Amino acid sequence: MEYQGQHGGHASSRADEHGNPAVTTGNAPTGMGAGHIQEPAREDKKTDGVLRRSGSSSSSSSSEDDGMGGRRKKGIKEKIKEKLPGGNKGNNQQQQQEHTTTTTGGAYGPQGHDTKIATGAHGGTAATTADAGGEKKGIVDKIKEKLPGQH
């Protein structure tokens, strides 16, 4: 039984201009036509197995001085710290920020709602402040909390 595209010929094996096998069937012409799209000839540049770099050199912020005259690649943590405000501080400086609320006494006494809650087993305390605005934390604030030395 013959299928579509087969017209009683026998299969022959040929190679194209790049040495790849090209199988044709029957006596159909193998040029343009018959649904075949010819690719434009491309010139392959041979480098004899040697990788060559371009003469262009550009400065990149993905590496920094390692202190010994060489360069080293920055980690993802260092790149994130660079983008955050205050992230360009030296690694030796550990600044801790304290969030305090000062209340001033009015005619009826202090108006702030600062409370300290004992955590029990660990003996520490956790400060909670009830803000009138109830402002939610943004993504950047959440990331800042997770970075060491930012509290």
From Swiss-Prot:
One GO term (biological process): response to abscisic acid
GO cellular component: cytosol
Keyword Magnesium: no
Residue ranges, compositional bias (Low complexity): 90-105, 117-132
Keywords assigned by UniProt, alphabetized: Stress response
Stretches for region Disordered: 1-138
Inducing stimuli: By abscisic acid (ABA) and water stress.
Keyword Transport: no
Stretches with biased composition (Basic and acidic residues): 39-51
Matches recorded under Pfam families: Dehydrin (PF00257)
Family: Belongs to the plant dehydrin family.
PANTHER family, A to Z: DEHYDRIN RAB16D, DEHYDRIN XERO 2-RELATED
Protein name as it appears in the record: Dehydrin Rab16D
Organism of origin: Oryza sativa subsp. indica
